[in-house]
């Protein structure tokens, strides 16, 4: 006998498949069995049809194709006997889905079986319909399902309700047919029918507002009574789960009450008492009770306001936070985050418990609790919360320190009551987790320090102390050497001592030692060492007695394999040795940096193709030169190399001061002496400028430390090129006249318009540079509200360069307007049009508003 004939039993086939030792053997067994089944199908063997289909279902579950057996399902369904129909419907649900065209052929059989006199066959048809019903089948069979909702047998009514749910999901328009039958099911005593009826009514309410109003008026009181009866019912072994009567029905009723009470005060008042009873009397020592309590809390927080109930609900969530089950604590944290918008004061009372969750061993709970704490922080509690988080930072796991550090820095920066507290907390974070502090954070710290002149001495002394215990934190080292370079005299002289400070004695040599250690430390990278060299140059001016030692330390890097450090060492040594008359001017103390400008730039997160600069476009980090010495002879470097033009740099200090080192293009020509000198001085003091073209000279710009991989192209000289450098040097040297020849031949456009804001663009062209377009953006407020913290951001494709000037104001008056100028250079003029993505952010009455759009309607020819 063929072991794989149609007469083979299902168990024998399963045994043969499981006996296969390799995948190839299994495929061979399945292939032979499928061949035998195909032969049986072709012979129309009715005796073994049900057995063949059972085998196909098992083969299908193993992942092998069984499409050739789909018609066998229909043949078995059409059979008169119950056993054949059972296998047929089971195969239909398993081998087919609602997307199969074969389903069109089974609709008539389903309709006949739904009207069958045998209730078990009716049940089979309902099961199949509930699993694979398509939209077409739903429209054809909805009347039969509606009729069966009133069938005498509760099992049929239950299955019909589940089918009705599927029908409503597929064809929402049919929901009105089930409103009255669904309402009738809510009065059922049989729990199985009742739970499906509640589920059906919930689905109807979600898709039909008319049905929602109907159930609110007709069924709310009945549902409340049903829930009260179940909550107060005595022990029933049939429905009891962990001492609670039918928790599944509890949860379904609470979900429906939540839908009915949301947005309706009368319905909410009707259910307040029962919700309070469920919330206060349900035991929380078992999982079933916790599930009911969680659903009850969700319902309380969703219905119309009742202060006492909400406090009760949030207290339940607070108890959840003390539960040993991580899942319960996690869902409690999630729910508390959603509750913040409803009753933040009640959530604040559980702050200590939430803070303990931050210290939990479970990573998911840690992160969720940290997010919740971050939302709870305000001006009143920032000090104790920041203190707790910073203390935990010392002992937290390495994997969690990054997120924790970022949140602490954001909290401290956002809610700091005073600058000295902000500086103290940031120094603690830098000391404990400096390696996790992002660049924009410590850049912002430097901006705050420059804006607190009365704290300069205190800050530099605090940093000096911190370095002795946390020298491995590179970010701390960078901030410290920057401050020592700027305020070394205050460190040594103990200037600006505060009452809370302990006296400290620091000599000039001690200050030099700290910076020298930063250069020689094995963890210091190129950026840190470059900053340390600049700090040493400044110290040599602050402390003339240490000049020789500083010169010696700087000279040790003349042979560095890092060209960046090598050239800085050579040039700084030359400044100390040959140009003492201008050294003090070169290394003057940094001017106060504009906090508002930096915050706006930082919030914008503009892409690299966008440059935003101030009205005075050039500022040099770590000192502004003001001397009138001959620039060509400054360092005896007469190189002809010029820096490559750049549209923007991500370097902080260049970005912060709005440095715009781009050169206007012009016809090639000989470099003027003032231009060469300007480039040298620019190269000397810059930190983030791009590397220049090397034309055989070793004296090019080797001072760039962040953009050395930028594309390099020769810069062309222009009569207007030195203008920004002349601004830097207070106007020394000739100031070439600026061309005013601009044409306004392009029409204005409405770049963006919403119900609250309108943006107009006006265009002018520079006749000497047709690729460049000057745009004046006019922002018009269409509302009677004042827009504060107004910020316009834009991004363009790579073939465009965009330069943004600051807006005329960061506040847009009611029904008023402000202007902002920008310059767009199209390197593909004539080939590609200008396009731009824009984003506008502002606040209305303290609420953040963000509008975005794409501008494609620029005039042709730009």
UniProtKB/Swiss-Prot annotation:
Membrane topology: Peripheral membrane protein
Subcellular location: Golgi apparatus; Cytoplasmic vesicle, Clathrin-coated vesicle membrane
SMART domains to which the protein is assigned, alphabetical: Alpha_adaptinC2 (SM00809)
Ranges for domain GAE: 744-859
Entry superkingdom: Eukaryota
Cited Pfam families: Adaptin_N, Alpha_adaptinC2
HEAT repeats: 1-28, 29-65, 101-136, 137-173, 308-345, 346-382, 384-417, 418-454, 458-496, 507-545, 560-599
Function in brief: Subunit of clathrin-associated adaptor protein complex 1 that plays a role in protein sorting at the trans-Golgi network and early endosomes (TGN/EE). The AP complexes mediate both the recruitment of clathrin to membranes and the recognition of sorting signals within the cytosolic tails of transmembrane cargo molecules.
Identification of the protein by name: AP-1 complex subunit gamma-2
